[in-house]
């Protein structure tokens, strides 16, 4: 067990790691479209309208998600303003709270500060957690509520005090209710399918029958006011959200983001870096101790069952398995601390060598792509970015070697492998990536034209939300492609916000009498601009393009 001085040093180092990797780079990195610009704009419009009940995007009804995740982003923008830091801070905050909850859960399970500290550090330094936790999506919020729900579930199973058990199930319901208002019915399904094998194996079914209704009551109590409010405001919301967003997305043949069953295996392998060397041992240890150690069986079910559930679903995205990383971090922490305790340092040294290999592999690939192959990531003028990337991954390998050379004694140093990568990634992205996925610079370059435009049209929803966020205006028209706004654009009061190629010439002739018209495109690499009326100004930067039509009498 750690002494007080070691605890203070460990807490300081973890806080330093969190500040350097999670907070410092936030504002300096451009926003990615379509996700980050979408959530930035939704919250900006919510704050502008003062309506926290019905989500809108570009002043068009947007029913893909409930509102609790937006509320967190709203508060962030309300405190920090309209900037990239505020857009991402909600995600960072949720990862931070999740790490604290995992520390507390580890203490509940093992009463060992070393394991608890290692759990939190491993969690926040996992590549998947870091990548999603510094990216503005709703998954960190959803993962927070799932983590809190599972902590309450364990608390309810462990305590012998009836009063505390009642409290645990009531808080469990509150967490599920907030998770439901963040990402829908998944927040209710995940804790249930995880706890089912646990209570059956531990013969606690009667406890769930007796106390489970308390969780249901508290979940309904916290979510019902908003459920009723949005049903009164938008009667069609629940039809769309249940049938389209849940049933169609996860089970139908035309579900979004269809991927094979094994899709999450490579995602998981990459996601646990820089702790990949601990993955096999941690899972095997949990499986071997499933009978003798109820805590390990609890974590194993929490990790495996949602992973299988999301693998069976037809629609898949890397962000979906973020809730699986919390139990995996705890399993790895227990495995690592037990290795030190039992003198099995060679198992920890393996993780160091894995990071040496990963750092060296990244350096070789970067060097080969620029020097040997014809598939260069960077342009010749971007040599400094190339050097930055090589240095970052070189330091990754060096830290991995230190973990190995020091005989695994300082195995937790592996967390710092990615620290330089996190600091430089925003400055080391190739220009072709910036000019295809991060439109803020392109929009700022054409700020004058856009600011003086009476109408702005966009062929891409991601580009439309980027313009809306940068220009602080939500009256962007969709051009030819409906995208994710199709459902909202079909409402009678929003149909005028869609212009097709066929109708554009006639619409343009009328619109130019009112003022300048700007049309934005997000093209494929070699795609040509469509055949449209001749513009007064055309500008293209790799995949982004703008056509400007000046006002005519």
Curated annotation (Swiss-Prot):
Catalyzes the transfer of the L-Ara4N moiety of the glycolipid undecaprenyl phosphate-alpha-L-Ara4N to lipid A. The modified arabinose is attached to lipid A and is required for resistance to polymyxin and cationic antimicrobial peptides. GO terms for cellular component: plasma membrane. One of its GO terms (molecular function) is mannosyltransferase activity. The keyword Lipid biosynthesis applies. The chain crosses the membrane at residues 6-26, 89-109, 115-135, 180-200, 208-228, 258-278, 293-313, 317-337, 352-372, 386-406, 410-430. Induction: Activated by low magnesium concentrations, via the two-component regulatory system PhoP/PhoQ. NCBIfam families: PRK13279.1 (NF009784). This is Undecaprenyl phosphate-alpha-4-amino-4-deoxy-L-arabinose arabinosyl transferase. PANTHER family: MANNOSYLTRANSFERASE YKCB-RELATED, UNDECAPRENYL PHOSPHATE-ALPHA-4-AMINO-4-DEOXY-L-ARABINOSE ARABINOSYL TRANSFERASE. It holds the Pfam family PMT. It is found in: Cell inner membrane. Its EC number is 2.4.2.43. Pathway: Lipopolysaccharide metabolism; 4-amino-4-deoxy-beta-L-arabinose-lipid A biosynthesis. It comes from Photorhabdus laumondii subsp. laumondii (strain DSM 15139 / CIP 105565 / TT01). The lineage of its organism: Bacteria, Pseudomonadati, Pseudomonadota, Gammaproteobacteria, Enterobacterales. Belongs to the glycosyltransferase 83 family. Keywords: Cell inner membrane, Cell membrane, Glycosyltransferase, Lipid A biosynthesis, Lipid biosynthesis, Lipid metabolism, Lipopolysaccharide biosynthesis, Membrane, Transferase, Transmembrane, Transmembrane helix. It is a multi-pass membrane protein. It catalyses: 4-amino-4-deoxy-alpha-L-arabinopyranosyl di-trans,octa-cis-undecaprenyl phosphate + lipid IVA = lipid IIA + di-trans,octa-cis-undecaprenyl phosphate. One of its GO terms (biological process) is lipid A biosynthetic process. HAMAP family: ArnT_transfer.
């Amino acid at each position: 067990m750690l002494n007080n001085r070691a605890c203070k040093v460990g807490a300081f180092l973890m806080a330093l790691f969190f500040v350097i990797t999670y907070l410092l780079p936030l504002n300096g990195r451009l926003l990615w479209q379509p996700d980050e610009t979408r959530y930035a704009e939704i919250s900006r419009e919510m704050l502008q309208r003062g309506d926290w009940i019905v989500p809108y995007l570009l002043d068009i009804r947007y029913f893909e998600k409930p509102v609790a995740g937006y509320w967190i982003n709203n508060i962030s923008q309300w405190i920090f303003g309209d900037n990239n830091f505020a857009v991402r801070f909600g995600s960072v905050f949720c990862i931070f709270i999740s790490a604290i909850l995992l520390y507390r859960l580890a203490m509940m399970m093992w009463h060992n500060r070393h394991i608890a500290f290692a759990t939190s550090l491993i969690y926040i330094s996992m590549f998947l957690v870091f990548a999603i936790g510094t990216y503005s999506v709703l998954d960190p919020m959803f993962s927070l509520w799932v983590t809190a729900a599972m902590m309450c579930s364990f608390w309810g199973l462990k305590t012998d005090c009836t009063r505390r058990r009642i409290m645990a199930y009531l808080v469990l319901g509150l967490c599920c209710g907030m998770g439901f208002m963040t990402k829908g019915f998944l927040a209710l399904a995940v804790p249930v399918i995880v706890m089912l094998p646990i209570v059956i194996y531990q013969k606690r079914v009667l406890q769930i029958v007796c106390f489970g209704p308390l969780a249901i009551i508290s979940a309904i109590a916290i979510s019902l006011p908003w459920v009723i409010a949005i049903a009164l405001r938008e009667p069609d919301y629940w039809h769309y959200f249940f049938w389209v967003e849940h049933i169609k997305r996860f089970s139908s043949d035309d579900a979004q983001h269809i991927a094979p069953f094994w899709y999450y295996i490579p995602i998981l392998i990459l996601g646990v870096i820089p702790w990949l060397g601990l993955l096999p041992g941690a899972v095997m240890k949990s499986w071997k101790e499933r009978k003798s150690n109820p805590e390990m069986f609890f974590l194993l079910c929490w990790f495996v069952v949602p992973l299988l559930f999301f693998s069976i679903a037809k629609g898949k995205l890397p962000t979906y398995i973020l809730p699986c990383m919390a139990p995996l971090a705890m399993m790895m922490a227990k495995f690592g601390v037990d290795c030190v305790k039992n003198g099995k340092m060679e198992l920890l040294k393996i993780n160091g060598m894995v990071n040496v290999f990963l750092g060296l592999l990244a350096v070789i690939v970067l060097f080969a792509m620029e020097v040997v192959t014809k598939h260069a990531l960077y342009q010749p003028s971007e040599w400094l970015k190339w050097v930055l990337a090589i240095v970052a991954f070189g330091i990754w390998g060096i830290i991995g070697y230190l973990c190995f050379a020091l005989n695994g004694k300082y195995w937790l140093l592996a967390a710092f492998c990615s620290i330089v990568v996190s600091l430089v990634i925003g400055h080391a992205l190739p220009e072709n990536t910036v000019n295809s996925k991060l439109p803020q610079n392109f929009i700022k370059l054409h700020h004058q034209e856009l600011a003086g435009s009476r109408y702005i049209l966009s062929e891409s929803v991601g580009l439309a939300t980027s313009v809306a966020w940068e220009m602080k205006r939500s009256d962007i028209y969709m051009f030819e492609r409906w995208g994710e706004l199709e459902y909202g654009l079909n409402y009678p009061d929003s149909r005028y916000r869609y212009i097709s190629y066929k109708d554009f010439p006639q619409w343009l002739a009328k619109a130019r009498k009112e003022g300048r018209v700007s049309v934005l495109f997000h093209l494929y690499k070699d795609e040509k601009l469509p055949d449209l009326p001749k513009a007064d100004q055309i500008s293209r930067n790799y995949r982004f393009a703008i056509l400007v039509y000046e006002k005519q009498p």
